[in-house]
């Protein structure tokens, strides 16, 4: 009783095809496919834009900070 057999699924599919019609089901399938395709393209665009947004910082070793400059001038 837990899972349905293949015959149960075939009967359900036939009933759905009779209720909605094959043309309507084809339109739903193509809409779903285009939505998945658009989602995948959006994910590719988002991952391609991510490295461009990151700013690289360079560290210079001999720079002084204001606190260090103030301490040097007081000494």
Swiss-Prot record:
How the protein assembles, per its UniProt entry? The Tat system comprises two distinct complexes: a TatABC complex, containing multiple copies of TatA, TatB and TatC subunits, and a separate TatA complex, containing only TatA subunits. Substrates initially bind to the TatABC complex, which probably triggers association of the separate TatA complex to form the active translocon.
Q: Which family does it belong to?
A: Belongs to the TatA/E family.
Q: Where in the cell is it found?
A: Cell inner membrane
Bilayer-crossing regions: 1-21
This protein's major location comes to: membrane
**Keyword annotations:** Cell inner membrane, Cell membrane, Membrane, Protein transport, Translocation, Transmembrane, Transmembrane helix, Transport
**Protein name from the UniProt record:** Sec-independent protein translocase protein TatA
Q: Which cysteines are joined by disulfide bonds?
A: none
Q: Which is one Pfam family of this protein?
A: TatA_B_E
């Amino acid at each position: 009783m837990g899972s349905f057999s293949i015959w149960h699924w075939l009967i359900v599919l036939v009933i759905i095809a009779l209720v909605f019609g094959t043309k309507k089901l084809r339109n739903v399938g193509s809409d779903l496919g285009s939505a998945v395709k658009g989602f995948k393209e959006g994910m590719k665009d988002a991952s391609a834009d991510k490295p461009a947004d990151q700013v690289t910082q360079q560290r210079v070793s001999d720079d002084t900070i204001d606190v260090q400059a103030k301490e040097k001038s007081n000494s």
